[in-house]
Protein backbone atom coordinates (compact mmCIF):
# COMPACT_ATOMS: atom_id res chain seq x y z
CA UNK A 1 0.00 0.00 0.00
CA UNK A 2 2.93 2.35 0.56
CA UNK A 3 3.82 2.18 -3.13
CA UNK A 4 0.35 3.48 -3.97
CA UNK A 5 1.15 6.67 -2.09
CA UNK A 6 4.85 7.07 -2.85
CA UNK A 7 4.89 5.99 -6.49
CA UNK A 8 1.45 6.97 -7.77
CA UNK A 9 0.24 9.90 -5.68
CA UNK A 10 3.56 11.55 -4.79
CA UNK A 11 6.00 10.68 -7.57
CA UNK A 12 3.58 10.64 -10.51
CA UNK A 13 1.03 13.25 -9.44
CA UNK A 14 3.24 15.30 -7.09
CA UNK A 15 0.69 15.25 -4.28
CA UNK A 16 1.54 17.30 -1.19
CA UNK A 17 -1.79 17.10 0.63
CA UNK A 18 -4.17 14.14 0.61
CA UNK A 19 -7.88 14.15 1.39
CA UNK A 20 -9.82 10.91 1.86
CA UNK A 21 -13.15 9.70 3.11
CA UNK A 22 -13.46 7.89 6.43
CA UNK A 23 -13.82 4.47 4.76
CA UNK A 24 -11.13 4.88 2.08
CA UNK A 25 -9.17 1.73 1.24
CA UNK A 26 -6.23 1.54 -1.13
CA UNK A 27 -3.22 -0.43 -2.29
CA UNK A 28 -2.79 -4.15 -2.92
CA UNK A 29 -5.83 -6.07 -1.70
CA UNK A 30 -7.07 -2.83 -0.12
CA UNK A 31 -4.56 -3.24 2.69
CA UNK A 32 -4.27 0.51 3.19
CA UNK A 33 -6.77 2.40 5.33
CA UNK A 34 -7.12 5.93 6.66
CA UNK A 35 -5.01 5.25 9.75
CA UNK A 36 -2.12 4.03 7.60
CA UNK A 37 -2.62 6.98 5.29
CA UNK A 38 -2.55 9.42 8.18
CA UNK A 39 0.60 7.82 9.64
CA UNK A 40 2.41 7.80 6.29
CA UNK A 41 1.61 11.45 5.64
CA UNK A 42 2.81 12.47 9.10
CA UNK A 43 6.09 10.58 8.63
CA UNK A 44 6.77 12.01 5.17
CA UNK A 45 5.71 15.62 5.63
CA UNK A 46 2.47 15.38 3.64
CA UNK A 47 -0.73 17.11 4.63
CA UNK A 48 -3.69 14.84 5.34
CA UNK A 49 -7.39 15.38 6.00
CA UNK A 50 -9.85 12.57 6.68
CA UNK A 51 -13.48 13.43 5.99
CA UNK A 52 -15.78 11.98 8.67
CA UNK A 53 -18.94 10.02 7.91
CA UNK A 54 -21.81 12.28 6.85
CA UNK A 55 -25.44 11.18 6.96
CA UNK A 56 -28.56 12.66 5.40
CA UNK A 57 -32.02 11.31 6.12
CA UNK A 58 -30.42 8.31 7.80
CA UNK A 59 -28.33 7.46 4.71
CA UNK A 60 -24.54 7.69 4.57
CA UNK A 61 -23.50 10.18 1.89
CA UNK A 62 -21.16 8.36 -0.49
CA UNK A 63 -20.17 8.43 -4.14
CA UNK A 64 -21.49 4.88 -4.50
CA UNK A 65 -24.94 5.86 -3.27
CA UNK A 66 -25.03 8.99 -5.44
CA UNK A 67 -24.03 6.98 -8.52
CA UNK A 68 -26.85 4.53 -7.82
CA UNK A 69 -29.32 7.42 -7.71
CA UNK A 70 -28.10 8.78 -11.04
CA UNK A 71 -28.24 5.36 -12.65
CA UNK A 72 -31.86 5.12 -11.47
CA UNK A 73 -32.71 8.54 -12.93
CA UNK A 74 -33.22 10.05 -9.48
CA UNK A 75 -31.36 13.27 -10.28
CA UNK A 76 -33.46 15.39 -7.93
CA UNK A 77 -32.56 13.14 -5.00
CA UNK A 78 -28.92 13.03 -6.10
CA UNK A 79 -28.78 16.84 -6.04
CA UNK A 80 -29.75 16.78 -2.36
CA UNK A 81 -26.70 14.64 -1.59
CA UNK A 82 -24.32 16.43 -3.96
CA UNK A 83 -25.28 19.89 -2.75
CA UNK A 84 -25.76 20.95 -6.38
CA UNK A 85 -27.40 19.67 -9.53
CA UNK A 86 -25.63 16.89 -11.41
CA UNK A 87 -24.25 18.43 -14.58
CA UNK A 88 -22.65 17.43 -17.86
CA UNK A 89 -20.44 19.70 -19.94
CA UNK A 90 -19.36 19.16 -23.50
CA UNK A 91 -19.01 20.47 -27.04
CA UNK A 92 -22.06 20.78 -29.28
CA UNK A 93 -21.66 18.68 -32.41
CA UNK A 94 -23.64 18.26 -35.61
CA UNK A 95 -26.33 15.61 -35.44
CA UNK A 96 -28.31 14.04 -38.26
CA UNK A 97 -30.52 17.11 -38.69
CA UNK A 98 -33.71 15.15 -38.09
CA UNK A 99 -34.82 17.24 -35.13
CA UNK A 100 -34.36 20.53 -36.96
CA UNK A 101 -36.31 19.34 -40.00
CA UNK A 102 -39.21 17.44 -38.43
CA UNK A 103 -39.25 18.17 -34.69
CA UNK A 104 -37.43 20.82 -32.69
CA UNK A 105 -33.83 22.02 -33.20
CA UNK A 106 -31.59 20.25 -30.71
CA UNK A 107 -28.05 20.50 -29.38
CA UNK A 108 -26.13 17.23 -29.49
CA UNK A 109 -23.51 17.09 -26.78
CA UNK A 110 -20.13 15.40 -26.74
CA UNK A 111 -19.31 15.12 -23.00
CA UNK A 112 -15.91 16.35 -21.87
CA UNK A 113 -15.15 12.98 -20.29
CA UNK A 114 -16.75 9.65 -19.50
CA UNK A 115 -19.86 10.30 -17.45
CA UNK A 116 -21.80 8.18 -15.04
CA UNK A 117 -24.36 6.01 -16.82
CA UNK A 118 -27.50 8.06 -16.35
CA UNK A 119 -30.76 6.20 -16.73
CA UNK A 120 -32.01 6.48 -20.28
CA UNK A 121 -34.92 8.83 -20.66
CA UNK A 122 -35.98 12.46 -20.84
CA UNK A 123 -34.92 15.04 -18.27
CA UNK A 124 -35.77 18.62 -17.37
CA UNK A 125 -32.48 20.48 -17.56
CA UNK A 126 -30.99 23.95 -17.29
CA UNK A 127 -28.59 24.86 -20.08
CA UNK A 128 -25.70 27.27 -19.51
CA UNK A 129 -25.12 28.98 -22.86
CA UNK A 130 -21.71 30.25 -24.03
CA UNK A 131 -22.87 33.88 -23.63
CA UNK A 132 -23.50 33.35 -19.92
CA UNK A 133 -27.28 33.12 -20.19
CA UNK A 134 -29.35 30.11 -19.14
CA UNK A 135 -32.43 28.52 -20.62
CA UNK A 136 -34.75 25.59 -19.98
CA UNK A 137 -33.85 22.35 -21.70
CA UNK A 138 -35.54 19.05 -22.49
CA UNK A 139 -32.74 16.51 -22.63
CA UNK A 140 -32.94 13.00 -24.02
CA UNK A 141 -30.31 10.53 -22.87
CA UNK A 142 -30.68 7.48 -25.09
CA UNK A 143 -30.81 6.08 -28.59
CA UNK A 144 -33.75 8.09 -30.06
CA UNK A 145 -35.71 5.00 -31.19
CA UNK A 146 -38.38 6.96 -33.09
CA UNK A 147 -35.95 8.62 -35.51
CA UNK A 148 -32.86 6.39 -35.48
CA UNK A 149 -32.10 2.69 -35.71
CA UNK A 150 -28.61 3.16 -34.30
CA UNK A 151 -27.90 1.88 -30.81
CA UNK A 152 -25.55 4.71 -29.84
CA UNK A 153 -26.46 6.56 -26.65
CA UNK A 154 -26.51 10.33 -27.19
CA UNK A 155 -27.25 13.43 -25.12
CA UNK A 156 -29.64 15.57 -27.14
CA UNK A 157 -31.29 18.74 -25.83
CA UNK A 158 -34.11 20.94 -27.06
CA UNK A 159 -33.31 24.43 -25.76
CA UNK A 160 -36.70 25.99 -25.14
CA UNK A 161 -36.99 29.45 -26.71
CA UNK A 162 -33.41 29.49 -27.99
CA UNK A 163 -32.65 30.23 -31.63
CA UNK A 164 -28.96 30.34 -32.42
CA UNK A 165 -25.90 28.43 -33.57
CA UNK A 166 -23.97 26.56 -30.87
CA UNK A 167 -21.95 24.17 -33.03
CA UNK A 168 -18.41 23.75 -31.74
CA UNK A 169 -19.15 25.66 -28.54
CA UNK A 170 -19.27 24.47 -24.93
CA UNK A 171 -22.59 23.79 -23.23
CA UNK A 172 -23.31 22.76 -19.66
CA UNK A 173 -26.50 20.95 -18.64
CA UNK A 174 -27.80 20.78 -15.07
CA UNK A 175 -30.19 17.86 -14.55
CA UNK A 176 -33.23 18.91 -12.50
CA UNK A 177 -35.69 16.03 -12.79
CA UNK A 178 -36.56 12.85 -14.67
CA UNK A 179 -39.63 13.36 -16.86
CA UNK A 180 -40.24 10.05 -18.59
CA UNK A 181 -38.70 6.95 -20.07
CA UNK A 182 -37.47 6.89 -23.63
CA UNK A 183 -39.97 5.25 -25.96
CA UNK A 184 -40.58 4.66 -29.64
CA UNK A 185 -43.50 6.72 -30.93
CA UNK A 186 -45.68 5.74 -33.87
CA UNK A 187 -44.85 8.95 -35.75
CA UNK A 188 -42.63 12.02 -35.59
CA UNK A 189 -45.76 14.11 -35.02
CA UNK A 190 -46.57 12.13 -31.89
CA UNK A 191 -42.98 12.62 -30.71
CA UNK A 192 -43.21 16.35 -31.53
CA UNK A 193 -46.33 16.69 -29.39
CA UNK A 194 -44.71 14.86 -26.48
CA UNK A 195 -41.58 17.05 -26.62
CA UNK A 196 -43.81 20.14 -26.56
CA UNK A 197 -45.57 18.72 -23.51
CA UNK A 198 -42.24 17.92 -21.85
CA UNK A 199 -41.08 21.49 -22.53
CA UNK A 200 -44.06 22.85 -20.61
CA UNK A 201 -43.30 20.45 -17.77
CA UNK A 202 -39.66 21.51 -17.71
CA UNK A 203 -40.55 25.21 -17.59
CA UNK A 204 -42.44 24.53 -14.38
CA UNK A 205 -39.51 22.65 -12.84
CA UNK A 206 -36.28 24.38 -13.88
CA UNK A 207 -35.03 27.45 -12.05
CA UNK A 208 -33.06 29.85 -14.23
Summary of predicted features, one role per range:
Residues 1-105, 184-190:
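Classical nucleotidyltransferase
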Residues 94-208:
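Phosphate/ribose-recognition catalytic cores of enzymes acting on nucleotide-derived substrates
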